[in-house]
Amino acid sequence: MPERMNFGKLRDVLDIPDLIGIQIESYKSFLQLDTDPKERKNQGLQEVFNEVFPLESFDKQMVLEFESYTIAPSKKDVVDCIKDGISYTGALSVDFNLKVKDAVFHETVSLGDIPLMTDRGTFIINGAERVIISQLHRSPGICFEKTRHSSGRMLYSYRIIPDRGSWMEVQFDINDLIYIYLDRQRRRRKFLISTFLRAIGYETNRDMLSAAYEIKTMTPAQLLKAEDLSAFHTVEPVYSADGALLIDEFMKLDESLVKLLSDSKVKHVDLVFIPDGDSYLLNCLARDPAKTPEDALREIYRRMRPSDPPSVNNAKQLLKRLFFDNKRYDLGTVGRYKLNERLGLNLPLTERILDKVDLMEATKALMKLRNVAGQTDDIDHLGSRRVRTVGELLQNHCRVGLYRTERLIKEKMSLINADETGITPNKLINPKAFIGVIRDFFARNQLSQFMDQTNPLSELTNKRRLSALGPGGLSRDRAGFEVRDVHTSHYGRICPIETPEGPNIGLISSMSLYAKINEFGFLETPYRRVVDGVVTDQIDYLTADKEEHFVIAQANAPLDKEGHFINPTVMSRLYGDSAERPREEVQYMDVSPKQVVSVATAMIPFLPNDDANRALMGANMQRQAV
């Protein structure tokens, strides 16, 4: 193949990647067709089956276990499917084991047809070529925010957003007490954070205080020498040798109280060291009506279910259903990754439900934020938004279909006597609900569209499109200006130019030329690493939140033959701000001037000479050329 000639001023450091690889790789990892059924990773369709099965009957007499699945190749090729007006699908067969008392019945059950992706990253549904648009949505994880109270004070809060399940919000009130809201609709149902922490594992005041602050055991003599005496508070009530109460719990020490301890011959006392203005959790404990875990559970149940009589067992079940049941609450791998990253935790990514450490560390971070009036999170930043590709979108729908099937299987199990003969998996499983959900997704979902076939560019753009609309996303009526606007974190990830004019402006966008999606769904863009002032050809892909901490030079910065910057100062970016900086500070460099824009925009000649509005029209109109 003859070598392509380049008339540009800059050499290409990195080849343009496979532009439809996003679609193909996503669906490949969803189906895992090339992997042996016994060696498949716990992802995609395999993960959904592992989540739902094994299923146990109510009387524990029958257990239905999932073993593996296979997908047969399509009976007709793509061209014949289009010609005959049928779907390009493969038959999904699943191996199940049914255990009835001591007997085991093995059977392969057909769950219907599942659409297969063509080599072009499309699907053939009823003879028509369709594309599934990737969805840009708010990432699971934790988000710190601030709102201004009517009195003018700034109230800090955080939200823990799961992939599936109830949101949780924790917020300071006007009196500097920390309250937790478990119900977004009924915000009056709030209770102190200490009540919730006590209910989920921090049973005593000492447990809570030692996790949030530093506890020291000190003698009265040591206290008299302490410089910051007012920073010490009692953890528990202090009694004299004859049992008389000397100092109540949570009391701030002063010289008179230390003298009282010394005169009463108290040898040592446990104290919590809290610097001035950081006693928010201590104040919550002092105001907390619940003093034991049982009290805390009853208090939570009383607030959440005001009409029901509170009981400890019911409260435990309610909390388990809301936050500690894998089937109802799932942070997802992404949610756990974001929590670990934001709070400095080291919990495994498989730990996908909330842990008491998550809440304690988040509350500590919130108190620190309140103290230093720190920077809250930007919800429009691409560190807080991720892409759901075709595989993940279909996986979520398959999960819904299988949970419906699960309900039907359990009902059938309860109607069948375990002593009956001839019970097989086929008699228990009705695949209609599962097939129906998949058909509905491809035929009616907002993100499933007829492929734009006007020209090759329109086809390619259609497959690289990102939409903030669709189920679980925004609606065009409620989306404000901020979410539609170009953000500094879009650099090299989302094209700032190519977007529709009209009501969808900013909500539908296109991936930049070199952008790729990482394992967690975050957009990454490539940069050349700068080592000891020399620009190397080593390429690092960075996400938006990682990129912010580096000084990054533009692709057109002049270099000598060895890769050193010629000019003493270089136009570069740091934390989203562009400025001239000394060349010694530069850590990365853009790979190409094209990396900012999408495929369609990159085809506009002399793009920098265009007005942004005209470039937008040009990028869109190229797709209409016949």
State the predicted function of each range.
Residues 505-507, 519:
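Extended hydrophobic-aromatic, low-complexity segments
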Residues 494-501, 508:
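Conserved helicase core region in the C-terminal RecA-like lobe
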Residues 105, 465-496:
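Flexible, glycine/threonine-enriched loop-and-boundary segments that flank and lead into catalytic domains
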